[in-house]
Amino acid sequence: MVSVEEVRRAQRREGPATILAIGTATPLNCVDQTTYPDYFFRVTNSDHKTELKEKFKRMFERSMIKKSYLHLTEEILKENPSICEHKAPSFDARQDIVVVEVPKLGKEAAQNAIKEWGQPKSKITHLVFCTTTGVDMHGADYQLTKLLGLSPSVKRLMMYQLGCYGGGTVLRLAKDLAENNKGARALVVCSEITAITFHAPSDTDLDVLVGQALFGDGAASVIIGSDPNLEVEKPLFELVSAAQTLVPDCGHKIYGKTSDVGLTFHLHKDVPRLVSQNIEKSLVEVFQPLGIFDWNSIFWVGHAGGREILDQVELKLGLKPEKLNVTRHVMSEYGNMASACVLFVLDEMRKTSTKEGFGTNVEGLEWGVLCSFGPGLTIETIVLHSVSI
């Protein structure tokens, strides 16, 4: 009779989990941030709040975000006027949008990843889906399984309400799935639509303005598996190690509350300082075994959480300005897309390196880090090893 240990050994893989393909998608509606303040105050019937509008414009200028993509169009808002009324009961209207559109946008990103991967969908064994909104039964994982026509035996994992650190979480979990299940190929999807957090401006709730200035919609997907078949698969990044940590006593610094008005988001002014002061502890934890302590010797896939956060992390760690260039570029072109953000940055980084002819997928460097952070205050840290091109 076969022993339990023999069964376990047969299930495990020898090599590290590897990203085999990346795909992204955005809504068609592109918003120019130079005109968005006027649009936002007009559609919410708030043009009379002139001082608040000027404050909003200054927020945009400081954010360095040039454009973003939003599912909500003026037509959709006219069809759902309660969404534009300050603190009006509107959860049902918002929910009806996101439970349909979050899986649909995720499908686009997943199809792009599957196309790049070049293998039949029947080889997908696991599905990991992450979104901040649209909690429902059946969940977005079920909806995406049906939309893509995946096998009914695909093993699904659904994660809601993680917020901005979710992109790191899905990679950490997919790493464990790939390395502990022989032949596993995990389809990972992060899809975010801000319809649930769109609120009319208010003098007493400036967090609304911060959210409108920072956030955009987008979806990203990766295929992850161990021991790639090099005849038909092209490995991009190996997931070497992963860690998650909570910054003590910071649960009130970033949080959201779901109610009949939708999801209200709160971001404390101390967040940039707290992230910058605590991120190095996470870096040391994952890079010490590799003997790496020079943070300029690695490539950076950072969460595009906002200009102030990036500025303070750069200053605290003594990073060269170019280390966060790709993260800043993604932020300027898409805004903060919550869990999908770091995967957009990873995709942009490997594309840039390919164009510039580097020997690896990122800046010619071998080692790198992916960092995401969000409610909790939670920090996810992934050590990446770039595969030679």
Swiss-Prot record:
EC identifiers of the protein: 2.3.1.74
GO terms for biological process, alphabetical: flavonoid biosynthetic process; polyketide biosynthetic process
Keywords assigned by UniProt, alphabetized: Acyltransferase, Flavonoid biosynthesis, Transferase
Tissues expressing the protein: CHSF does not appear to be pseudogene, but expression of this gene could not be detected in various floral tissues nor in seedlings after illumination with UV light.
Protein's pathway: Secondary metabolite biosynthesis; flavonoid biosynthesis
Gene Ontology MF annotations: naringenin-chalcone synthase activity
Any matching Pfam family: Chal_sti_synt_N
UniProt-annotated catalytic positions: 164
InterPro entries given in the database record: Chalcone/stilbene_synt_C (IPR012328), Chalcone/stilbene_synt_N (IPR001099), Chalcone/stilbene_synthase_AS (IPR018088), Polyketide_synthase_type-III (IPR011141), Thiolase-like (IPR016039)
Reaction catalysed by this enzyme: (E)-4-coumaroyl-CoA + 3 malonyl-CoA + 3 H(+) = 2',4,4',6'-tetrahydroxychalcone + 3 CO2 + 4 CoA
Role: The primary product of this enzyme is 4,2',4',6'-tetrahydroxychalcone (also termed naringenin-chalcone or chalcone) which can under specific conditions spontaneously isomerize into naringenin.
Sequence similarity: Belongs to the thiolase-like superfamily. Chalcone/stilbene synthases family.
Descriptive protein name: Chalcone synthase F
Name of encoding gene: CHSF
